[in-house]
Regions:
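Cytochrome P450 catalytic-core helices
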Residues: 130, 147-156, 160-172
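Amphipathic alpha-helical interaction segments
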Residues: 21-24, 48-53, 67-70, 128, ...
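Hydrophobic mid-domain F-helix/FG-region of cytochrome P450s
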Residues: 4-5, 26-64, 72-81, 114-117
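Cytochrome P450
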Residues: 1-4, 15-24, 35-52, 60-67, 88-111
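Amphipathic, well-packed alpha-helical segments that form the structural scaffold of globular domains
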Residues: 3, 7, 11, 23-31, ...
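Secondary-structure capping and boundary motifs in well-ordered enzyme cores
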Residues: 18, 42-47, 105, 140, ...
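Cytochrome P450 catalytic core segment centered on helix I
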Residues: 29, 70-141
């Protein structure tokens, strides 16, 4: 049932609507990076672009983008003390056993998702990827709250991991 809810939101016509927004964001990030004579392209471009783009297409306020990037790092790099204070193989993770990646970042993202998704449901008129996913299918199927929170975390994890490393590996 989840696939039917997600397919429409990530269809080519829907994503095409974000092309200009994505171009503007990419230009903004590149312009800021190129202000410096030298910079770490992975940090300044590959780390920033996917999460900031994701934030915009799912309706997360720009003011929360830095937080989302940091939580994405904590979630995915949960074995690296450079990215998280909660290194999973060095601490008791039982408290977070039901959270993505057994991480407190998963809990933080669940709580954020709950508030963000509630705002989207209350407003009802927003046009973004998450608002589309929250809409019932033709058959009346809706994504339940826990699935919505998990999906939000999945988007953060995928945006932070797959897209970042794809961009990083393409930079020469």
């Amino acid at each position: 049932h989840t696939r039917a809810l997600v397919n429409k939101a990530f269809s080519r016509p829907v994503i095409a609507k974000y092309e200009e927004l994505i171009r503007e964001l990419a230009s903004e990030i590149l312009d800021k990076a190129f202000e410096e004579e030298e910079f770490d392209a992975v940090e300044r471009i590959a780390r920033q672009l996917p999460m900031r783009m994701l934030a915009r297409i799912i309706g997360v306020p720009d003011a929360d983008s830095d937080w989302l990037v940091a939580k994405g790092d904590e979630l995915i790099a949960n074995t690296d003390p450079n990215y998280t204070d909660f290194v999973v193989d060095q601490v008791d993770t039982n408290e977070f056993r039901l959270m993505p990646f057994r991480s407190p970042a998963g809990k933080d993202l669940f709580e954020y998702a709950d508030k963000h998704l509630s705002r989207i449901r209350e407003r009802g008129e927003e046009e973004n990827i998450l608002s589309m996913i929250l809409q019932p299918t033709k058959e009346g199927t809706v994504m339940i709250e826990s699935d919505s929170q998990n999906f939000f975390c999945l988007l953060v994890a995928a945006g932070n991991d797959t897209a970042r490393y794809s961009i990083a590996s393409s930079i020469k």
